[in-house]
């Protein structure tokens, strides 16, 4: 990405706290076209930046391709927060059209006490493959990944994260929420690797899946590698459906079915939505409910 010709480049000087939420907007307008933008963000010592990314596309019967590369570099005591709300066209109810979303996202915490936070809300595209990663090279560095992946109709989403611990006393957290409706398939695929010299490092992973139909699928594929005995790794996973008792509870209180489903979806995703900036969180919550209109009931 050092030689990319288009996209975004952001450098935060030492001892600088960026006062604004930097943002970009990507859109694919043409039929059968591809978008290959590059993003490079470098946060120097003792700096902070929050970067927002939004994606949309018009409806076509043909497929388009989005294959971007995002690279984050955090130096000593620096923090980078990267948030994405992805709403590419997902195709029609029969699975025709839509964007193929194949994205490479990676970050490296080079300096000690550095931090990279990935937050993403995936609601669009016909097929999504995305695995944001953190290489925790600096001692005491932190990597976090928070994700909501919603699929409906014939969408396929294969998302997750990679946390590679190299420095000592490094910490990582993975929080994944998957919602499947229609005939869609939603998979979490993640790697947690703690190297031989990453003593006293720790990882916590939580993968929750919610099924909204009898024909949708949810999968979890965690890969865990611990190469020294002084580490702690925790992994939790759950798969559930919205039960009749829950719906009955809302109906008894005068809340109709559509609003009941909306409230339950918001509660299921609350932990991830709270990681987004306030304006983004409100819009992302509305987007999730909009994508599921008419799905249940």
UniProtKB/Swiss-Prot annotation:
Disulfide bonds: none annotated. Keywords: Chloroplast, Plastid. Pfam families: SUFBD_core (PF01458). One of its GO terms (cellular component) is chloroplast. It is found in: Plastid, Chloroplast. GO terms for biological process: iron-sulfur cluster assembly. Belongs to the iron-sulfur cluster assembly SufBD family. PANTHER family: FES CLUSTER ASSEMBLY PROTEIN SUF, UPF0051 PROTEIN ABCI8, CHLOROPLASTIC-RELATED. This is Iron-sulfur cluster assembly SufBD family protein ycf24.
